[in-house]
């Protein structure tokens, strides 16, 4: 099944009122963050994906409510999927997504490639087992 059948990149809810701007520098811990008066609101725990720039395809889990930086889209994943399974899948293809950007001046995530990636969809319990195994292996190589 193609990734497009279980997830999509959405803009987020337009809102007004002072909120923290969740840009890449803030999310990487390299800035204290700035506030802005309007933007595309996301909630703590949402996942957002970098769609513009050098690191297109990088996914972040939102640490607090705020406005997405302008280089992000919100990553919506179907409830039939175990979210960590999909996030690990996207992480597996991170280099492909970074190297297949579109645009000359400011490279953008190639959404055609993103949405056309083929993902196996095992039963939900198997998705959970796979993620647990990935986590076990990852903890041993850290």
Q: PLM features: what roles do these ranges have?
A:
Residues 1-14, 21-28, 116, 120-142:
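Non-catalytic DNA-recognition/assembly elements of restriction-modification systems
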Residues 85-93, 103-105, 118:
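Conserved catalytic alpha/beta cores of large enzymes that bind or transform nucleotide phosphates
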Residues 91-98, 138:
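Short amphipathic alpha-helical signal-transduction/dimerization elements
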Residues 66-73, 103-124:
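A short glycine-rich beta-alpha junction/loop motif
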Residues 38-91:
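A short beta-sheet element
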Residues 1, 37, 43-44, 81-88, ...:
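Generic recognition of stable, solvent-exposed alpha-helical segments in well-folded globular domains
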Residues 31-37:
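Short alpha-helix capping/helix-loop boundary micro-motifs
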């Amino acid at each position: 099944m193609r990734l497009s059948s279980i997830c999509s990149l959405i803009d987020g809810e337009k809102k007004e009122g002072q909120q923290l701007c969740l840009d890449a520098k803030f999310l990487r811990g390299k800035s204290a963050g700035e506030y802005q008066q309007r933007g595309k609101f996301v909630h703590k725990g949402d996942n957002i994906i970098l769609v513009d720039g050098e690191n297109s395809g990088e996914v972040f889990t939102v640490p607090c409510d705020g406005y997405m930086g302008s280089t992000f889209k919100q990553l919506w994943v179907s409830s039939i999927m175990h979210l960590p399974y999909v996030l690990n899948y996207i992480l597996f293809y991170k280099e492909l997504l970074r190297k297949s950007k579109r645009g000359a001046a400011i490279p953008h995530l190639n959404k055609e490639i993103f949405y056309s990636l083929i993902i196996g969809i095992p039963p939900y319990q198997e998705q959970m087992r796979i993620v647990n195994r990935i986590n076990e292996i990852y903890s041993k190589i850290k």
